[in-house]
């Protein structure tokens, strides 16, 4: 038994080498497509296996299990689930712009339903798929050994059409990713032919032909042309895609909105669920109901709250809050013809494809030319055999080694003699000189054409262009599959903020929030609140008079702001609902609740003695998680949020020192810790108040309001310590 060999290797070096090997394997052999055929290895192996099984468009279907078995057994030694998922996606008309596989059976749905098991489904190639492998048997591409050296597989596909851009691709590798949306094949062919005629064309010229992505699910791209062009110039960007909808008139002036197309890669079922949740949470008050009436075509019916609602505004609110508008990323990170990953722009991708087609046609022409030369040589031998038929038959019958004798007697090559000897005697007798001459002449014409293609670059590019033109004619705009599905619109309402409060009846309400964070609203103002009940151990903390159309600001002890629509607060005589169900406030306390007023100033203060002024427009939160405005250190809290309605500020803390200074000394900020309001030593700020100096400083003491007009003794600069408060000031060091 041999002794095991142990080497001392630096762990860091070994780890980095192995990780690099893994990363390269992921990038080159799994996640990124090749710019030439737009396929990843698993796609290439799957389609080649189907070609070997002769699953052509005009043949019968075969079980997907058989296809997957061949793929993982011969070419792709990975899990059957991954291969079947790939097969399913290539057959889904809502995933691929030009499906490469024709599936029979349940291949999933746009709702996100899974496909049936592979033992139930069947498949074959589509017509456009055969273009990817056209002429693969004519030495157009290199082959390599499979993983077990038992067979060969193509390194690349001949690809008669630009599959990378036509069908797009997406994948995540180690440290890089790719995301290429699908495009219209007719437009791509126009761009390629223009590039052949004008090799020095720039991206701006190409954009005259390629308008933008063309998604299998349709939709409307609302980006401006300069934004789209910029994305294609850099190879990175994104496209904003909206659902297509129409207004459907009903009786008595009532209407409904019908969505007929949804953005690419948006699952219909999840979209409906998303809208339903917003309806339940009263986030879209302009909508009363949504229902799915889809069959083979998409039909989502949205009912407005009432017929006076502008359908454009209804849809704007839905676009803002749901996936009816989504952003499709563009990241053209692909493996180039030099086997190096690179983010390419649209021009580079098209040039790479044309170079690939140039190489394919060159190799095909060379292959066919060699075949013709071989056949011409044989025909020349057959013509000699025809002219000397009796003598050749005699040699074949009588001589033991007819090959050498025939080569010497008639000056024939070995190939010619082999062809004659391999021809059956009956066939030799039926040889006709005219047939040989006709075939010889035709082959010479073909030979001249092929030699012209190989020797004249202009002729070669003519062939490339002719074949692209043929693809365009077969799958262009005038065909069912080729017509553009995604359109473009300039949306003027994109940046408009939809004021949903305009559709809420304005009614007075009183908002009540308890110490334990239970919130509710009662109709009207000036209510008698003596009969209000709270949970055991709870009591009132905030009482706020507002209107149903108001937006309510909730400030937490950690300095985070939350925004609620007053109409969404629980109504009735119960204990209400926990604030935690409405906003993600966590275990923090509520510092203040205010009615939002546009362009009003608010003063924020923390227990550490710092604060700043902020505009109310800056604190509006758009999400349930809120917006962090005041940064509070550990061990401290945000103690106050006050409307700025005076010229002076009074501060008092645990040190029982009162400081009064001008409010103009506090800067206005958007967020942060703020500046020092009052200096403390081993103490905290407890309370703060804004007032007008000429009115005097007031506070509550023993249920009575006391007023101090003479506050000169307490005046100081912001950041000072302050002085002891006047006699009778509350012992809890608070103004109220």
Swiss-Prot record:
GO CC annotations on file: chromosome; cytoplasm; DNA topoisomerase type II (double strand cut, ATP-hydrolyzing) complex; extrinsic component of plasma membrane
Site (Transition state stabilizer) residue list: 119
Chief location of this protein within or outside the cell: membrane
EC number: 5.6.2.2
Gene Ontology terms: biological process: chromosome segregation; DNA topological change
Residue ranges occupied by any Topo IIA-type catalytic domain in the UniProt entry: 32-496
Site residues by UniProt (Interaction with DNA): 40, 76, 78
Subcellular location: Cell membrane
Active-site residues annotated for this sequence: 120
Statement: the UniProt record of this protein carries the keyword Zinc: no
Pfam families: DNA_gyraseA_C (PF03989), DNA_topoisoIV (PF00521)
One of the record's GO molecular function terms: DNA binding
Top-level division of the source organism's lineage: Bacteria
This protein's UniProt keywords: Cell membrane, DNA-binding, Isomerase, Membrane, Topoisomerase
Its membrane topology: Peripheral membrane protein
Catalysis: reaction(s): ATP-dependent breakage, passage and rejoining of double-stranded DNA
Assembly: Heterotetramer composed of ParC and ParE.
PANTHER family registered for this protein in UniProt: DNA GYRASE/TOPOISOMERASE SUBUNIT A, DNA TOPOISOMERASE 4 SUBUNIT A
Family (UniProt): Belongs to the type II topoisomerase GyrA/ParC subunit family. ParC type 1 subfamily.
Function comment: Topoisomerase IV is essential for chromosome segregation. It relaxes supercoiled DNA. Performs the decatenation events required during the replication of a circular DNA molecule.
UniProt name for this protein: DNA topoisomerase 4 subunit A
């Amino acid at each position: 038994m041999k002794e095991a060999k142990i080497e001392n290797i630096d762990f860091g070096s070994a780890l980095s080498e192995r990780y690099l090997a893994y990363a390269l394997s992921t990038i080159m052999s799994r996640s990124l497509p090749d710019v030439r055929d737009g396929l990843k290895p698993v796609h290439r192996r799957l389609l080649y296996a189907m070609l070997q099984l002769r699953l052509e468009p005009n043949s019968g279907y075969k079980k997907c299990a058989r296809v997957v078995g061949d793929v993982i057994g011969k070419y792709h030694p990975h899990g059957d689930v991954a291969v079947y998922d790939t097969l399913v996606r290539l057959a889904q008309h809502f995933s691929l712009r030009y499906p490469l596989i024709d599936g029979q059976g349940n291949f999933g749905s746009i709702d996100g339903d899974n496909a049936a098991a592979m033992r139930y489904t069947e498949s074959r190639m589509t017509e456009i798929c055969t273009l990817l492998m056209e002429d693969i048997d004519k030495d157009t591409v290199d082959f390599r050994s499979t993983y077990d050296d038992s067979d060969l597989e193509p390194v690349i596909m001949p690809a008669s059409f630009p599959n990378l851009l036509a069908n797009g691709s997406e994948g995540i590798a180690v440290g890089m990713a790719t995301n290429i949306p699908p495009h219209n094949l007719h437009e791509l062919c126009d761009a390629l032919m223009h590039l052949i005629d004008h090799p020095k064309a720039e991206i701006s010229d190409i954009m005259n032909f390629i308008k933008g992505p063309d998604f299998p699910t349709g939709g409307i791209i609302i980006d401006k042309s300069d934004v789209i062009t910029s994305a294609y110039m850099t190879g990175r960007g994104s496209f904003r895609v909206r659902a297509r909808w129409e207004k459907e008139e009903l009786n008595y002036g009532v209407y409904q909105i019908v969505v007929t197309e949804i953005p690419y890669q948006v699952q219909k079922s999840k979209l409906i669920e998303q809208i339903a949740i917003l309806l339940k949470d009263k986030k879209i008050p302009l909508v009363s109901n949504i229902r799915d009436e889809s069959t083979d075509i998409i039909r989502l019916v949205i009912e407005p709250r009432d017929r006076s609602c502008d359908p454009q505004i209804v849809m704007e609110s839905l676009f803002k809050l749901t996936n009816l508008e989504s952003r499709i990323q563009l990241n053209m990170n692909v493996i180039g013809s030099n086997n190096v990953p690179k983010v390419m722009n649209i021009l580079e991708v098209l040039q790479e494809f044309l170079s690939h087609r140039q190489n394919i046609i060159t190799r095909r022409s060379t292959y066919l030319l060699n075949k013709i030369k071989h056949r011409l040589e044989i025909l020349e031998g057959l013509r000699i055999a025809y002219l000397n038929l009796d003598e050749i038959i005699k040699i074949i019958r009588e001589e033991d080694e007819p090959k050498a004798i025939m080569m010497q007697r008639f000056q024939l090559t070995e190939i010619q003699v082999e062809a004659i000897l391999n021809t059956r005697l009956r066939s030799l007798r039926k040889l006709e000189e005219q047939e040989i001459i006709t075939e010889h002449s035709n082959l010479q014409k073909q030979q001249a054409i092929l030699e012209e293609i190989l020797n004249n670059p202009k002729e070669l590019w003519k062939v490339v262009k002719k074949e692209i033109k043929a693809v365009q004619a077969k799958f262009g705009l005038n065909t069912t599959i080729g017509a553009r599905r995604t359109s473009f619109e300039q949306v003027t309402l994109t940046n408009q903020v939809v004021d949903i409060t305009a559709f809420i009846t304005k009614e007075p309400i009183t908002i009540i929030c308890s110490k334990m964070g239970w919130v509710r609203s009662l109709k009207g103002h000036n209510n008698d609140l003596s009969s209000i009940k709270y949970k055991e151990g709870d009591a009132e903390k905030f009482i706020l008079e507002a209107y149903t159309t108001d937006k309510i600001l909730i400030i937490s002890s950690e300095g985070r702001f939350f925004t609620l629509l007053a109409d969404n607060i629980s109504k009735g005589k119960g204990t209400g609902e926990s604030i935690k169900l409405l906003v993600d406030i966590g275990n923090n306390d509520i510092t203040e609740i205010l009615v939002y007023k546009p362009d009003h100033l608010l003063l924020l203060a923390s227990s550490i003695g710092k604060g700043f002024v902020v505009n109310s427009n800056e604190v509006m939160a758009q999400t349930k998680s809120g917006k962090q405005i005041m940064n509070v250190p550990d061990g401290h809290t945000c103690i106050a949020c006050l409307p700025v309605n005076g010229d002076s500020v009074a501060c008092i803390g645990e040190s029982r020192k009162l400081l009064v200074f001008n409010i103009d000394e506090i800067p206005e900020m958007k967020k942060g810790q703020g500046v020092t309001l009052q200096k403390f030593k081993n103490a905290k700020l407890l309370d703060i108040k804004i007032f007008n100096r000429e009115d005097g400083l007031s506070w509550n003491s023993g249920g009575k309001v006391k007023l101090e007009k003479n506050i000169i003794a307490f005046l100081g600069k912001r950041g000072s310590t302050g002085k002891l408060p006047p006699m009778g000031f509350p012992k809890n060091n608070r103004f109220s």
